[in-house]
UniProtKB/Swiss-Prot annotation:
InterPro entries xref list: PPI_Ypi1
Region described as Disordered: 1-76, 92-157
Origin superkingdom: Eukaryota
Family: Belongs to the YPI1 family.
Function, in words: Regulator of type 1 phosphatases which maintains protein phosphatase activity under strict control.
Compositional bias segments (type: Basic and acidic residues): 1-10
Protein's UniProt name: Type 1 phosphatases regulator YPI1
Polar residues bias (residue ranges): 11-29
Gene Ontology CC entries for this record: nucleus
Gene coding for it: YPI1
Subcellular location, principal: nucleus
Species whose genome carries this gene: Laccaria bicolor (strain S238N-H82 / ATCC MYA-4686)
């Protein structure tokens, strides 16, 4: 059994604006549609309906709906899906606040260079035990902690 496309439009016709198509399949041998007797109706086997992408009008209706529990991250009355937060792992009060992992901390017990190489990072009395000061209190915040400066001026409403 062969199937033919009963779509009579030329192939150069552009697609419908909504991207939908309908093809009707008929059974029987392929025949020349121009010489076909009009009294002989082809038997319809099935109809295939294809639906493409949504139209521009339908796409513009899709909006994000925020739940009431969504956090206003910037305090400006705007709710956003792109949230820039820095997670600081909770630590015990006697833990170091440096960002090194346990493996890096254990590596600090090994001395690969002269004590002069580590003079800025360790105090002489605790050399080989632990890091006492990596970043001073006067150090500038990193790019994630700093408040971005915007060229645009914000209006207070």
């Amino acid at each position: 059994m062969q199937y033919t496309d009963t779509h009579h439009e030329p192939s150069s016709v552009s697609a419908p604006s909504d991207g939908s198509r309908t093809h009707t399949l008929t059974s029987g041998a392929t025949r020349d549609l121009e010489n076909e007797d009009e009294s002989e109706a082809p038997r319809i086997v099935g109809t295939l309906k294809l639906r493409g992408a949504q139209s521009k009008k339908q796409q513009s209706k899709a909006k994000v709906a925020w739940d009431e529990d969504v956090v206003d991250n910037e305090g400006c009355g705007k709710k956003k899906s792109k949230i820039c937060c820095i997670y600081h792992k909770p630590r015990r009060f006697d833990e170091s606040s440096d960002e090194s992992s346990d493996s890096a901390a254990s590596d600090s017990d090994c001395s690969h260079g002269s004590p002069a190489d580590n003079a800025g990072l360790r105090s002489p009395s605790t050399l080989g035990h632990h890091v006492t000061n990596i970043r001073g209190d006067d150090a500038e915040p990193n790019a994630y902690e700093a408040t971005p400066s915007s060229g645009k001026k914000r209006r207070n409403v």
